[in-house]
Design a protein with these regions (language model features):
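Nucleotide-sugar donor-binding catalytic core of glycosyltransferases
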Residues: 1-128, 142-154, 158
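Catalytic binding pocket for nucleotide-activated donors in carbohydrate/polymer assembly enzymes
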Residues: 93-98, 107-220
C-alpha cells in the first residue's frame, strides 16, 4: 500500500542519514602534539538483559558504573562523562548519567579534547570501539584487561599503550598517575598514535590483512 511504501522509505532514509551525518575519519584522528585538557573521559552505555545476547548484563554494567562512581568521587572536575542517558540507564543508574554529547559526531569531537580515556571490554569480550577511538585521538588509555581477552594481530602492550586496572580504585590510581606525569603521558600519546597509524587506521588495517593473506597462501 502507499502507506507501507512511505514507511519503508522513511526507514531507509533514516538509515542513510545515520551514515551521511556520522563522523568522518578526520573527526576521530588527532596527532599527539595537539594540546588536550588534563582530564579523564569515560562515557559509555549500560545494557538490559535482552540486549546483550549470551553475555551477562550485570557484569558488564556493574564494572562500568562502579568505575564511574569512583572516578567522579576521587577526581571531581578532572573527570568528564558518565552513562549515555538511555531509558534503562535513567531507571537503574540515575546518579551517573552524562550530560555530555551522545550523538556520534559531536561526541567524538568532544571526547578527544581530554588526555586520558578509560576503556573496558565490549559485549561478549569484544574489542570496544572506544579503544580505537582513543588510539586515533592519540589519547592515553587506562584499561581493564578483559578488554584485551581476544588477541589482536599485534597486541597492545601494557605500560606502553595503556595502563591496566583491576578495580575501580586502581583505575583512579592509574588515571592520577598519567595526569601527574607529563613525560609518561606524552610517551603514551606518541606510542598510541604510532600504533593507530600502523595497525588500526583503515588503510593500514586493510594492508595488514592482505599481507597476512599473501603470507598464508605462500606457505601452502
Amino acid at each position: 500500500s502507499p502507506q507501507e511504501a512511505l514507511t519503508h522509505w522513511r526507514r531507509k532514509w533514516g538509515l542513510y542519514r545515520t551514515f551521511l551525518d556520522g563522523p568522518t575519519l578526520k573527526d576521530f584522528e588527532q596527532t599527539p602534539d595537539v594540546p588536550v585538557e588534563p582530564k579523564v573521559v569515560f562515557q559509555t552505555r549500560v545494557w538490559s538483559e535482552k540486549e546483550v545476547g549470551p553475555d551477562n548484563h550485570l557484569a558488564v554494567n556493574s564494572l562500568r558504573v562502579e568505575v564511574m562512581r569512583r572516578l567522579r568521587a576521587e577526581l571531581g572536575d578532572q573527570f568528564v562523562g558518565g552513562l549515555v542517558p538511555t531509558a534503562y540507564a535513567r531507571e537503574h543508574y540515575p546518579d551517573v548519567l552524562s550530560s555530555a554529547p551522545a550523538r556520534r559526531q559531536k561526541f567524538i569531537r568532544w571526547s578527544k579534547r581530554y588526555l586520558v580515556g578509560v576503556y573496558v571490554r565490549g559485549l561478549n569480550y569484544s574489542y570496544g570501539f572506544r579503544f580505537a577511538e582513543h588510539l586515533a585521538a592519540s589519547q592515553c588509555v587506562v584499561a581493564h584487561p578483559e578488554g584485551f581477552r581476544n588477541p589482536a594481530p599485534v597486541q597492545p602492550q601494557e605500560g606502553v599503550h595503556y595502563l591496566p586496572f583491576a578495580t575501580p580504585e586502581e583505575c583512579v590510581k592509574q588515571c592520577k598517575r598519567v595526569l601527574d606525569d607529563t613525560e609518561l603521558a606524552q610517551a603514551m600519546r606518541n606510542a598510541n598514535y604510532q600504533y593507530y597509524q600502523q595497525q588500526v587506521a583503515p588503510a593500514a588495517h586493510l594492508w595488514n590483512c592482505l599481507e597476512r593473506g599473501r603470507e598464508y597462501y605462500a606457505s601452502l
